[in-house]
UniProtKB/Swiss-Prot annotation:
Glycans are attached at N167. This is High affinity immunoglobulin alpha and immunoglobulin mu Fc receptor. Gene3D superfamilies: Immunoglobulins. It comes from Pongo abelii. It is found in: Cell membrane. The gene is FCAMR. N-glycosylated.
């Protein structure tokens, strides 16, 4: 009979489900403090989606409180708040944040208030305690899928005391579509957002800048990168890298309109902005092809500009990138064939500086004479080209076919690198700053400039330097002589003062007759006294 009972017990134990042996510290329930929050840690695994549902029924009344589900995005950060009872014991206790497993019954400390941080979480986790508020905050940054799992935030010298369990999940970034805006007429709209793919609604990093004037805007898609778009009521942007712009009704009529150009991404190959068309040539359409090649610090950029009657394109090819990016800008003209602007390709690197500085030196007042317009700079010996029809007046009258070489109005512009067009071997550096109003372009080698009508100004400026030098030397010699004269006068005054002091000291040593005793003074003044006379003192009779 006893043998049969033993066999039944063994058979029953073989059909029982295997259970994990609990932690030895949890076997003695009576020895645990009253604030201990018991949980079945053996059943908590990092792979379980809700790690806090399988808990023990033992819960302390002052257990920690906080969020049970924390979610973040890859590369982002999460903030976890753990509230505890603000008692005097809890304020000074150790606060920690740990992760369960592996093995599943061990909670490995990530960060605690004892200045401990796990080596895998350094520079991305921080724990801040607020004892007066009964709160400590854990912040985890640079999230990755490896951070998914179950975590505990608790109080106590060990990680099995008073704690709160939570589940951390990493979710994918939200998908979005490209918005469509409808600003009012003449409104400038600039947005910075990702660009959308024509197939899916996933965004890729990039920046699209929209600039235009009209009543309706419709942007569909673009490629990753940086681009500028000009659109209006009749224009629609198609998927790709080509932007179409159609002017509105009468809103682009006044003034000169700047045609947008693609913004290059490389800082070394920064191209200058398009130069606006002069007022005299607003109704004229140029048809030519200009190609300029220059080499920057890090990349070689070839700019080719094609201007035709019906459309204009700007093509930018970058040689330092593994792929070829082509940005095109096409402007459709209206029925009257109105030229919105002149798109001129950048010719040389020095043109960038000239465009920034030359407008300060181009305008010349009508009150200036002809000599101030056609002069050259003696120190630099360089000529700067200008446009008489746009900004320069000769004797107060605008001209059409005459190119005037004029001196930069400020030394700051010439030293910063104006366009210096010199004859002879300076040919490659010559660049026109603006298009001529009427007439063909004139090469810098031909003598088509209006030179100074007063050549004697140059000789007078040359003789001015020696005269100023001699004048400076003369003034220096006069100052030296004056200083010597003052020094001699000061020396003579000091010598006279020393002599006077010595005489005063001598008179103090030899007393005057008034300072002698009364008897001696009487003897000196008494001339009637005989020569043999002598003063005798009466003798006293000695006493008995």
């Amino acid at each position: 009979m006893p043998l049969f009972l033993i066999l039944c017990l063994l058979q029953g134990s073989s059909f029982a489900l295997p259970q994990k042996r609990p932690h030895p510290r949890w076997l003695w329930e009576g020895s645990l403090p009253s604030r201990t929050h018991l949980r079945a840690m053996g059943t908590l695994t990092p792979s379980s989606p809700l790690c806090w549902q399988e808990e023990s029924s033992f819960a302390a009344p002052n257990a920690l409180k906080g969020s049970r589900l924390v979610s973040g995005e890859p590369g982002g950060a999460v903030t976890i708040q753990c509230h505890y009872a603000p008692s005097s014991v809890n304020r000074h206790q150790r606060k920690y944040w740990c992760r369960l497993g592996p093995p599943r019954w061990i909670c490995q400390t990530i960060v605690s208030t004892n200045h401990y941080t796990h080596h895998r979480y350094r520079d991305r986790v921080a724990l801040t305690d607020f004892p007066q508020r009964g709160l400590f905050v854990v912040r985890l940054s640079q999230l990755s899928p490896d951070d998914i799992g179950c975590y505990l935030c608790g109080i106590g010298s060990e990680n099995n005391m008073l704690f709160l369990s939570m589940n951390l999940t990493i979710s994918a970034g939200p998908s979005s579509t490209l918005p469509t805006a409808t600003p009012a007429a003449g409104e400038l709209t600039m947005r910075s957002y990702g660009t959308a793919s024509p197939v899916a609604n996933r965004w890729t990093p990039g920046t699209t800048q929209t600039l235009g004037q009209g009543t309706a805007w419709d942007t569909v898609a673009s490629t990753p990168g940086t681009s500028m778009t000009t659109a209006s009521a009749e224009g629609r942007e198609t998927p790709g890298a080509t932007r179409l712009a159609t002017p509105g009704t009468g809103s682009w009529a006044e003034g000169s309109v700047k045609a947008p150009a693609p913004i290059p991404e490389s800082p070394a190959s920064k191209a200058p902005a398009p130069i606006p068309e002069s007022p005299a040539s607003k109704s004229r359409s140029m048809s030519n092809t200009t190609e300029g090649v220059w080499e920057g610090t890090r990349s070689l950029v070839t700019n080719r500009a094609k201007a035709s009657k019906d459309r204009r394109e700007i093509t930018t090819t970058k040689a330092d990138r593994p792929r070829e990016d082509t940005e095109g800008v096409r402007i459709a003209l209206d029925a009257a064939k109105k030229v919105l602007g002149t798109i001129r390709p950048p010719a040389l690197v020095s043109e960038t500086l000239a465009w920034e500085i030359f407008p300060q030196a181009t305008p010349v007042s009508k009150q200036q004479s002809l000599s101030s317009i056609g002069e050259t700079t003696p120190a630099a010996g360089m000529w700067t080209l200008g446009t008489p029809a746009a900004d320069v007046w000769i004797l107060g009258t605008p001209t059409a076919d005459v190119w005037t070489s004029m001196e930069a109005a400020s030394g700051e512009g010439s030293s910063a690198g104006d366009l210096d067009a010199a004859t002879g071997d300076r040919g490659p550096q010559v660049t026109l700053s603006q298009a001529p109003a009427v007439g063909p372009w004139r090469p810098p080698g031909k003598e088509s400039f209006v030179k100074s009508t007063f050549p004697e100004d140059e000789s007078s400026s040359r003789t001015l330097a020696p005269v100023s030098t001699m004048l400076a030397l003369f003034m220096l010699m006069a100052l030296v002589l004056l200083q010597r004269k003052l020094r001699r006068r000061r020396t003579s005054q000091e010598a006279e003062r020393v002599t006077l002091i010595q005489m005063t000291h001598f008179l103090e040593v030899n007393p005057q007759p008034d300072q002698l005793p009364h008897v001696e003074r009487k003897m000196l003044q008494d001339d009637s006294l005989p020569a043999g006379a002598s003063l005798t003192a009466p003798e006293r009779n000695p006493g008995p």
